[in-house]
Amino acid sequence: MKANNAEAPDSSNAADTLKWVATFVLLVAAVVGNYLYGELSVVARAAGVIVLIAAALGVAATTTKGKEAIVFARESRMEVRKVVWPTRQETMQTTLIVLAVSIVMALALWGIDGIMVRLVAFATGV
């Protein structure tokens, strides 16, 4: 029974490797095709690149890692829905606080800079 379980990952691994090679070949074909068919219209080349990238994503999605990535994306989307987003009022208040603190810090640094310039001028006799 363990021998059967050991064979399944190897065949799956080989299939995944073949799928990743196919994905890479499709992406290289998109880049090379875009370069070689430079005389065609931009729309035709863009359509070709989009089709090849979509095909590459489709092939990659059938691999083990691709399926894991799809599950991760779905779970991430569900987590984003659970986030409690701030109201417009909270957003505006926070933005104004950040703006006020930035202005105060800018004025403080400007003042410190002015004092330092005068101290250096006094020390050097300029």
From Swiss-Prot:
Keywords: Cell inner membrane, Cell membrane, Membrane, Protein transport, Translocation, Transmembrane, Transmembrane helix, Transport. Essential subunit of the Sec protein translocation channel SecYEG. Clamps together the 2 halves of SecY. May contact the channel plug during translocation. Component of the Sec protein translocase complex. Heterotrimer consisting of SecY, SecE and SecG subunits. The heterotrimers can form oligomers, although 1 heterotrimer is thought to be able to translocate proteins. Interacts with the ribosome. Interacts with SecDF, and other proteins may be involved. Interacts with SecA. The keyword Iron-sulfur does not apply. Belongs to the SecE/SEC61-gamma family. One of its GO terms (biological process) is intracellular protein transmembrane transport. It is found in: Cell inner membrane. It comes from Vibrio cholerae serotype O1 (strain ATCC 39315 / El Tor Inaba N16961). One of its GO terms (cellular component) is plasma membrane. The keyword Transport applies. Pfam families: SecE. This is Protein translocase subunit SecE. InterPro entries: SecE_bac (IPR005807), SecE_sf (IPR038379), Translocase_SecE/Sec61-g (IPR001901). The chain crosses the membrane at residues 18-38, 40-60, 97-117. GO terms for molecular function: protein transmembrane transporter activity.
